[in-house]
Amino acid sequence: MTLKIPIQEMVKMVGSLRSHGIDIPESMEINKKEKIYVAVTEKDLESKSSLVWAIQNSGGKEFCIVHVHQPIPGEMFHEQKLRLYRKEKDKAHKNSEKYLQICRQMQVTAEIIYIETDSVEKGILQLISQRGVTKLVMGAAADRHYSMRMRDLKSKKAIYIHREAPATCLIWFTCNGYLICSREARRANNLYLECASSNSLSQSDITRGTESIVKDDDHLIKLAVTEAEASKRKARFEACKREEAEKTAVDALKKAKQWENVYFEELKQRKETEKALRKRNDELEKMRSESETQITESYTVIRKLQEKNNLSMETFRGIREEQEELKIKLREVSKLKGKREEEEASTSNHREPPQYFICPITHDIMEDPHVAADGFTYEGEAISRWFERGHETSPMINKRLPHTSLVPNLALRSAIQEWLQLRELLNRPSACREI
């Protein structure tokens, strides 16, 4: 975009300068109060050295930080463009706040100007023309390109602005905190060329000075007309360029529409894929939950089996202890049996059997004696029926038994069988005669 400057405004500006043409100190005071513009880049504090140099060396107290932002290409999708634009805008605001903080720390006032245009250098030139900028500080190159021998501009933007900027603007080009070069304003040398140095000037000298200033004014007017014509040519060029850009934009919109259709198709496929993936994940989660439940149940069964096994082992140990006790008792019974047999051998056939041969339940001689948990011996079939009827107590002492296991009393059964055989022999007459 090209800014057209009317000739009347240029004449007005020249007339204002002429009113201060004689009083040099007052003019210098005005220059000190002018705003100094500092162009910064989008990168984080990349132009910090230029701003610090301007504050320390320009002598100004009011500064204007110029941030030129290049818009996002039009061929990008609308949503992507909006997100990227917001991101870049937030980044620019944060970067500008850092520059303002530097100004506050160095005790100077400053403001921020945002310019959005396709060309950084053209945006700065537009600002110079619109605001009548007279002092500008910008980078000659990135700080990383600085060297002690650096004397020329490296940045293409700086070279372009050095060549195309209005002649009324004084520009300092810095790099890494050092002044590389400057472009002096042309009017600064013309305004004071014929200024008087004392209060004793003659009328003719004043007249000649005035004529010189008028000539300078004519020169500035011609310069303004030339710049205005150049601006017209540039405007026509920009119009043609804009038409081409509009045509390119239409083509880009068509292409964007095609890509948008492709995008929505891919979005649809992605949603279907995500739906299938969620379904598969739900199935896997269900299988995992069922597996965990089965594992938990298995652990519970194993724990119960372990408890039963421990209980069985305790019962087995108890039975073994009881068997040991029964063996001791059986040995004692065997001794008593031997004595009894000796006594019974000499007794008559009508003698009653020993009391420990009689079952406490049936009151008959036992054929299959078994020892219960209470330590008493019973007929195996009789004590089994006792337990089958639901009894859990001892038939003899009526106390609850710790278990219903039975141990065969082999020694007692042998003694009973021997007693029965002996009694049978004693009952035979021939046997008695033989004895």
Swiss-Prot record:
Keywords attached to this entry: Coiled coil, Transferase, Ubl conjugation pathway
Biological process, per Gene Ontology: protein ubiquitination
Top EC category: transferase
InterPro entries: Rossmann-like_a/b/a_fold, U-box_ubiquitin_ligases, Ubox_domain, Znf_RING/FYVE/PHD
Documented EC number(s): 2.3.2.27
Top-rank lineage group of the source organism: Eukaryota
Name of the protein in its database record: U-box domain-containing protein 36
